[in-house]
Amino acid sequence: DYNATLAYLRKLVDSSELLELEQFGLSAQGRPLYLVKASKALHKIAQNPARPLLLVQAGIHSGEIDGKDAGLMLLRDIAQGEKTHLLANADLLFIPVLSADGHERRSLYNRMNQRGPLQQGWRATAQNLNLNRDYAKADAPEMQALLGVINRFQPDLYIDVHVTDGEDYQYDVTYGFTEPVAAISLNGASWLSKVYRPAVDAALTAAGHIPGPLVFGVDSLDFSKGISGWTASPRYSNGYGDVRHLPTVLVENHSLKPYRQRVLGTYVLLEQSLKLLSAQGKALILARQADMQARPKRMALSFKANEQPDHIDFKGTSYEVVQSDISGAPYVKWTGQPKLYKDLPVFWDDVVDKDAVIPKAYWLPPQYQDVLQRLALHGIEYSVLDKPLKVTLQQLAVNDYQFATKPFEGRFMVEKASFNRSMINRTLMPGWVKVSTDQALGRLAVALLEPAAPDSLFSWGFFAGMFERTEYFEPYAIEPLIVQLLAQQPELQQQFEQALAADEALRNNSRERYNWFYQKLRYYDQNYLKYPVLIEM
């Protein structure tokens, strides 16, 4: 249990001058969250920008707890002297359990498709939030605490350890990151692809493991149709790491492999990661700096699958398609027998679906304190206006939108929206907030404040109030105003008749007829459906 984990860590830390235990936050139920620092100079950890720092996180999904045991084993071996050399030129931060409340909701019956351990934690937090969907919106206290760790220590490499769901294959340790073809942080992604992956694959193979790519089947009933090469959005650890220039590796050990095998594979991956940082970490630091200093003119917001696949030889397993008497539908029954899929298609998510011109800045009115709090949690810099400022800015108005019909991760998301953009002259009053994109986290600011981005704060419903009207009209009040309006603008009569001819709902609804004119009166709410964030191009 969690207390036993902490008791073990305290004994380990007490036995070594190389380790230090630190509380960095509280779970939703009030459990303390801890990290372990491992360094030959604990008092200077993260103070030397030339010394690489590895952040390893386990238990973000507490049923997938391989990383905790692997990390505890590695810390033990470092503390007892066998692996002290791993800290020669690099330091380590280890979070044994991020979702502490989920860890304590342990049961024999939490994950039916995972082989071990016997007791498994729960996927979500006590607030029923999936922390690996929370990076961008940062609703959970656990995520807010984690962002504090990232901002404070500024790690150079981040490893997030999970266990898979889904298909069966021969690989026992699969992992992935944003590939260079779709990366915001191109230099960091190139280091992961050219330096990290070959070294980790070689170490795992030498230890008897079968490392593989992080992929998902295109067709659950026909694996031969190929696999999808996923590009994560910023709600996920690896997508978030890419947009904030933190090279991030998402480890997904194969759920159908024995627990011992998965833990030992994770140990090898973590050990090799430290070795690699000690030997080649300076190159990674330079890559990160180059990504943070880059100032591109455009930025991809989302990606879609490339219809022209690559091909790989994939170490899968054979299966049968069985007709279920219970569901009435076919399902896959894996045999566990090795099968090599020659030239299996891989459809990479490397085609830009949506992109945006990166503006000079975003301007936020002061009433959106929850949005400003999120920006601060992410480490995004902003300034507060102290005197009136006349400026020409871009205003976005929603012309079509749709909210989700059920909640996702505690929120009703804006599933789709289209915008009209126009330039306006505005005098901003003191208190308005300027978020410049000319900063290291400028592209993270775009991902959060550009409303078309899939994990923008707009998409997550932080600006839901803009979709509501709070002032209305009565027929006796609006009738004379419409007569007056038509006298002043007689061309509106023809426009109204054209609208009636084209719109059956308008023809058959007297209230909507009034509303057509109401939108043209000065009484109409000028903020309705207007995105409150103004954009400086």
List each model region and its residues.
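Structured catalytic-domain cores with a bias toward divalent-metal coordination
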Residues: D1-M537
